[in-house]
């Protein structure tokens, strides 16, 4: 799920559910894929450092929507909070700030447990989903990766919040908020939200993406029909499953390959042509 600014929303999500609502979908939800990343799989996480505990309601956030809310335009509740602050450093030097809401974790021990859990898992997904495709080095550089939105910076901040709400990503802050109490397949939803912040804009504005969508003629999940951004975000986990996971179910693999061959081919080419890192995963990209 993603929340966008007005201009950004009209640009990257030009295709809405109106064009897809009657299209066939293969899986009811992303969770139907089941967990594909195991605890013992390698992680690019180098270290997790506790920085401080904030005071006087230093941070501001907007809560996720309830699970029964179907309209993403519904008003979200905003609130101030304090947090245990951690920095997760990855092998490339990339840093993600974790803010663990003290209303969720009352003490440092619990906060560190959850920060480490998600920092490690973020280190297990392909690097380009975590670290983005646009580099900012004093000034914006497009790096020949397509038009995009100028926001594909990767994941800078992850908020770990209290409550049973839907996770969601915020382009403007390069962050997403997650809720451990929500019963998601966490590896899949982490990749989904990370995709919003790393490749969503580049892919939805790439001239070769929508022809691939049309050629497939269907969507991988029911939710992927919401708009083009959610299509990208849900599709990425299925691409990872068939290209990067050893011993993945042959039955599921064949079903996915048959359902969205053109999207998968696009993603293979996109990763190869732009020399995107999939570390720590080794992915079998097709010609």
Regions found by a protein language model. Give the residues of each.
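A metal-dependent hydrolase signature that marks the N-terminal structural subdomain at the beginning
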Residues: 15-162, 166-167, 276-287
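Terminal low-complexity, poorly structured segments
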Residues: 2-4, 26-29, 263, 272
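Classical Sec-dependent N-terminal signal peptides that target proteins to the secretory pathway
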Residues: 1-17
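Active-site-flanking segments in enzyme catalytic domains
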Residues: 75, 92-109, 131-287
């Amino acid at each position: 799920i993603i929340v966008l600014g007005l201009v950004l929303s009209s640009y990257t999500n030009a295709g809405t559910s109106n064009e897809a609502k009657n299209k066939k979908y293969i899986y009811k939800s992303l969770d139907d894929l089941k967990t594909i990343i195991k605890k013992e799989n390698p992680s690019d996480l180098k270290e997790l450092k506790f920085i401080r505990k904030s005071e006087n309601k230093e941070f501001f956030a907007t809560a996720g929507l309830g699970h029964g809310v179907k309209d993403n335009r519904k008003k979200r509740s905003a609130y101030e909070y304090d947090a245990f602050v951690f920095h997760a450093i990855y092998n490339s030097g990339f840093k993600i700030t974790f803010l663990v809401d003290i209303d969720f974790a009352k003490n440092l021990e619990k906060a560190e447990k959850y920060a480490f859990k998600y920092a490690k898992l973020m280190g297990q997904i392909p690097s380009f989903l975590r670290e983005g495709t646009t580099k900012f080095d004093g000034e914006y550089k497009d790096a020949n990766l397509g038009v995009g939105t100028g926001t594909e910076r990767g994941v800078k901040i992850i908020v770990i919040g209290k409550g049973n709400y839907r996770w969601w990503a915020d382009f403007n802050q390069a962050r997403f908020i997650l809720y451990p109490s929500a019963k998601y397949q966490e590896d899949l939803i982490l990749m989904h939200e990370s995709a919003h912040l790393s490749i969503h804009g580049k892919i939805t504005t790439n001239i070769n993406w929508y022809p691939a969508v049309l050629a497939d003629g269907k969507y991988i999940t029911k939710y992927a029909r919401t708009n083009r951004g959610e299509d990208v975000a849900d599709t990425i986990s299925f691409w990872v499953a068939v290209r990067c996971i050893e011993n993945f179910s042959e039955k599921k693999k064949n079903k996915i390959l048959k359902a969205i061959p053109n999207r998968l081919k696009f993603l293979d080419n996109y990763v190869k042509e732009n020399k995107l890192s999939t570390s720590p995963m080794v992915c079998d990209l097709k010609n």
